[in-house]
Regions:
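Non-globular targeting/processing and membrane-anchoring segments
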Residues: 1-34, 79, 84, 105-108, ...
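Nucleotide phosphate-binding site architecture
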Residues: 16, 44, 122
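Short, glycine-anchored, charge-dense loop/turn motifs used at functional sites
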Residues: 20, 113-122, 126
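Short active-site neighborhood of thiol/selenol oxidoreductases, capturing the structured segment around
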Residues: 25-47, 53
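Cofactor-binding loop segments of dinucleotide-utilizing enzymes, especially the Rossmann-like FAD-
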Residues: 40, 72, 117
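Structural microenvironment flanking redox-active thiols in thiol-disulfide oxidoreductases
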Residues: 47-85, 99-100
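Short, internal strand/loop/helix patches
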Residues: 83-118
Length: 164
């Protein structure tokens, strides 16, 4: 099974964060859209993508928008990853066996989903795709009623695509 496409209903889930808080998708969607970014700490493409997701979180995170990293690693390794890459958005732990990753059809990481408040996947991206991440930024801006900001800074040399 491939990752769930745009238009699919997002499976509802509850996971524990790396700091021990229980978080669930249904509650998060009540306040606005959710970006769920699945990753592994050892994945070079995930390491490359994480700082761009942090930029999105810094630009839009708050009362109208949620961004979660969903780690396929244990809490200790996930906390270390977040510290190393200066990640402030919450990191949730998908327990051994990856039940949530499996529900979303994850075969490659990073896999990033923009989930609209009604629970449908509006945008999805597998690997690093500059175009897909820009679409997610635009969808986030529109959903939060704020001006769009770019993931990418002027002068940065960013590949269009980097497989996961």
């Amino acid at each position: 099974m491939a990752a769930l496409p745009a238009g699919a209903k997002a499976p509802v889930f509850s996971l524990q964060s790396s700091d021990g808080k229980k978080l669930n998708l249904a509650d998060a969607l009540k306040k606005g859209p959710v970006v769920a970014a699945f990753f592994k700490v050892s994945c070079p493409t995930c390491q490359f993508t994480a700082p761009f997701l942090e930029r999105l979180y810094e630009s839009y995170g708050g009362e109208k928008f949620t961004l979660w990293g969903i780690s396929q690693d244990d809490a200790a390794d996930t906390r270390e990853f977040c510290q190393e890459f200066e990640i402030e958005f919450p990191a949730l732990i998908d327990d051994y066996g990856y039940p949530v990753s499996n529900q979303y059809g994850i075969t490659n990481v990073p896999s990033v989903f923009f989930i609209a408040p009604e629970g449908k996947i509006q945008e999805s991206s597998v690997g690093f795709s500059k175009k897909d991440l820009e679409k997610i930024a635009v969808a986030t801006a529109k959903a939060t009623g704020t001006p769009p900001v770019s993931f990418f800074k002027p002068g940065e040399v960013i590949p269009d695509l980097k497989p996961g």
